[in-house]
Amino acid sequence: MLTDNLDILLINIPISGLQYPPAGTSQLKGSVVDAGFTCTILDLNLDLFNKTGSDYSKFFDYFSEATHGDPEIDARVDQILDSWVDNVVKINPRVVGISVFTMMCQLATRLFTKKLKQKYTGKLVIGGAGISTNGIASAYNDF
């Protein structure tokens, strides 16, 4: 993964079906690279699957239905979120763009950006079809 002086890091945030990976970040990457910027994609949806394996359905439920209360799952989610933040901080892009593909991505976006803002000082852009419901677009902007 390109990390030296990276302009833009695009992130696919959980949770969306693995059988239909979102194409938005790939299309955006092509456009920003054509415009002369360096860019890479981080697929946190796939990373969640890789980190949870046979327990993936529990985490799918956690992020899509907000079914909380299992201390073990809560602790694992916290560890996973921390690992994602640490990865972004290590990459240290000038801009992080988070693709909120569906409204099922909103909880992961809120949890991730809350932690990310504590350690990452670059620009953060949130966009996608899933931000238009329940006020996530206005709740997490900084203008």
Regions found by a protein language model. Give the residues of each.
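Charged, often glycine-rich, active-site loop that binds/positions anionic groups
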Residues: 48-77
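Short Asp/Glu-rich motifs
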Residues: 20, 50-53, 136
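Glycine-rich beta-alpha loop elements in corrinoid/cobalamin-binding modules
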Residues: 24, 28-32, 44-46, 73-143
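Nucleotide-activated donor-dependent transferases that construct or modify glycoconjugates
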Residues: 6-17
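Glycine- and acidic-residue-enriched helix-capping/strand-helix junction motifs
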Residues: 16-25
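A short, charged/proline- and glycine-enriched loop
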Residues: 2-8, 92
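A short beta-strand-loop structural module common to alpha/beta enzyme folds
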Residues: 38-49
